[in-house]
A protein has these predicted regions:
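Aromatic, loop-rich ligand-recognition surfaces of beta-strand-rich domains
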Residues: 1-30
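A mature extracytoplasmic/lumenal domain signature
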Residues: 7, 19, 126, 178, ...
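Residues that flank catalytic or metal-binding motifs in active/ligand-binding sites
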Residues: 11-16, 118, 130, 170, ...
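Low-complexity, Pro/Ser/Thr- and charge-rich linker/hinge segments at domain boundaries
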Residues: 23-32, 191-227
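Beta/coil-rich, acidic/histidine-enriched accessory regions frequently appended to metallopeptidases
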Residues: 29-74, 436-502
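Beta-strand-enriched, solvent-exposed domains that form extended recognition/catalytic surfaces
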Residues: 33-202
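Catalytic cores of extracellular degradative/oxidative enzymes
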Residues: 214-410, 416-425
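Active-site-proximal alpha-helical
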Residues: 374-481
Length: 502
């Protein structure tokens, strides 16, 4: 048997234990079930099914049939135990295509959790030839605190009856990731029957719709974490903290954060593929330590801070309440426009855009007088501009450069799709992370191309055209910074083909 592993969490793969099972060719149970139920998911009893046929079933399935026939299957439980699960895109593929960190692949919550050692029955309908699995998401230790795990035990599913065992406590998520343009990327009906796992529920803004429904669902929930699925983000936060921060108006919170992510995606120019080809959510968790962070598959907001970042009025009460989360989500989206030495500022293009869209606070970043001092008094270039404040970078002065481009082209109206074009150009012709000096000049060239204007003097002012001779910088790793006279001349020559700015 040969295994080829093409992706893994954090680009690492390890195997602790692998088990093999023989596929059961015996379909007698399936045939018996289909004599009583209308399909293999066992969600509806045939009109002609007799009590004798029902009683002849294994006890577990007989109980399901009796509950359905007598209409005693609890409607709240049924709404989570019987679901049509929709397909979602492949996060690894689209992270590479769109130059982002990986979004989540936990797009399909079941609302059902298991305890360690539990076995569950999962009844799977027509899979249309697609590959499906169930993943059990529990907790992990991070230093001296716990947080939601990035991944967990995974069990593959086949059409028909599946009996699965789990060794850890956790919430079950249905994994259904495929090419959305495949004609067979269709919803799959799945039934996790009574007696298999414990229903805690979740709130889906598309189907549940109202604050009253949210209040009902979160009050009924029994698991430590409660899931809110919006259009673009999922909250998977401590239930008790959610009830304190958002006792009722969940629509204020989820609509705000769906908008914030939508605005960031708007800058990236990806409306040609989202949501038709890529539809994954960001997945926000509430660690019991640290502060805020962003990584592949999830973003974290410490559980003691949820009150500040959820309800619209609370977010608007202080500039940093919007800035911090927008900054972290910006890390998810910055890769195309980033090179080492700019990692804690290029994402703030998104943060400043969110402040603009919210309409209450002015932008952040140093005044242009700080740029003048850095260039003409301190004789600094881009790579060492200002005074390092975070990760060996003066983020306040650096972030002003991207925002000046936005102000000129978007706010002043000279080219209102400038950033969208620049993102697309840099996805097609990419900055090489290992060569930050060449990366900054490549950014300048593509910015001129996106604007269709010669931006030589703009980037000269920002210190891009100053020679740098093999300087080692440190920012999330060590990098050699080289900006040679040769590549400066080549960049100036390239930009000169475009007309002067208006």
């Amino acid at each position: 048997i040969k295994f080829e592993v093409h992706s893994g969490l954090g680009d690492f793969v390890s195997c602790d234990e692998m088990e093999f099972y023989q596929k059961n060719p015996d379909k007698k149970l399936d045939a018996q079930l289909l004599g009583v139920f209308t399909d293999i998911t066992c969600t509806e009893v045939r009109d002609e099914a007799t009590d004798a046929q029902i009683n002849a079933l294994p006890g577990y399935f007989a109980n399901i049939a009796i509950q359905l026939k007598r209409n005693t299957y609890d409607e709240w439980e049924k709404s989570f135990r019987i679901q049509d699960y929709h397909p979602y895109s492949n996060v690894e593929e689209w992270a590479e295509t769109l130059m982002t960190k990986r979004y989540s692949n936990l797009d399909n919550p079941t609302g059902i959790y298991v305890e360690a050692g539990d076995s569950v029955i999962v009844l799977v309908g027509d899979t249309h030839g697609q590959s499906l699995s169930i993943q059990c998401i529990g907790e992990e230790k991070s230093g001296d605190y716990v947080q939601t795990a990035a991944s967990g035990e995974t069990r593959f599913l086949e059409e028909g009856v599946n009996k699965l065992g789990f060794t850890q406590r956790g919430m079950l998520f249905l994994m259904y990731n495929t090419n959305l343009q495949d004609v067979n990327a269709k919803p799959v009906k799945i039934h996790i029957p009574l007696g298999s796992g414990y229903v805690s529920g979740f709130f889906d803004v598309k189907t549940d719709k109202t604050n009253d429904k949210y209040k009902e669902l979160i009050n009924k929930a029994t698991y430590k974490y409660f899931c809110i699925r919006g259009e673009r983000i999922m909250f998977y936060f401590h239930r008790d903290k959610m009830m304190q921060a958002v006792p009722y108006d969940i629509l204020s919170a989820i609509n705000l954060w769906d908008n914030i992510i939508s605005w960031q995606q708007e800058l990236m120019g990806i409306d040609d593929v989202r949501p038709s080809q890529v539809n994954n959510h960001l997945f926000a968790i509430s660690p019991e330590g640290s502060y805020m962070w962003a990584s592949d598959y999830r973003i974290g907001f410490v559980y003691t801070y949820l009150n500040n970042i959820l309800l619209y009025d609370n977010v608007m009460a202080a500039k940093d309440n919007a800035w911090g989360p927008a900054h972290e989500i910006g890390h998810i989206h910055q890769r195309a426009i980033n090179w080492p030495g700019s990692t804690e500022s290029s994402n703030n293009l998104f943060s400043n855009y969110i402040l603009f869209k919210l309409g209450k606070y002015c932008s952040r970043g140093s005044e242009l007088s700080a740029l003048a001092k850095a260039r003409f008094v301190d004789k600094q270039a881009w790579w060492n501009m200002g005074s390092a404040t975070h990760q060996n970078e003066d983020t306040e002065i650096h972030m002003r450069m991207n925002w000046q481009l936005w102000n000129y082209y978007h706010r002043c109206g000279y080219k209102t799709d400038f950033w969208q074009k620049l993102f697309k150009l840099l996805r097609e012709d990419r900055i090489v992370e290992s060569n930050p000096g060449a990366g900054q000049l490549h950014f300048a060239k593509m910015a001129s191309k996106a604007a269709n204007e010669n931006l030589t003097e703009f980037f000269r002012m920002w210190g891009f055209l100053e020679p740098v001779n093999n300087v080692e910088i440190e920012q999330y790793g060590k990098w050699n910074y080289n900006v040679t006279p040769t590549i400066i001349a080549e960049a100036v020559s390239y930009m000169s083909q475009f007309p002067a700015p208006k």
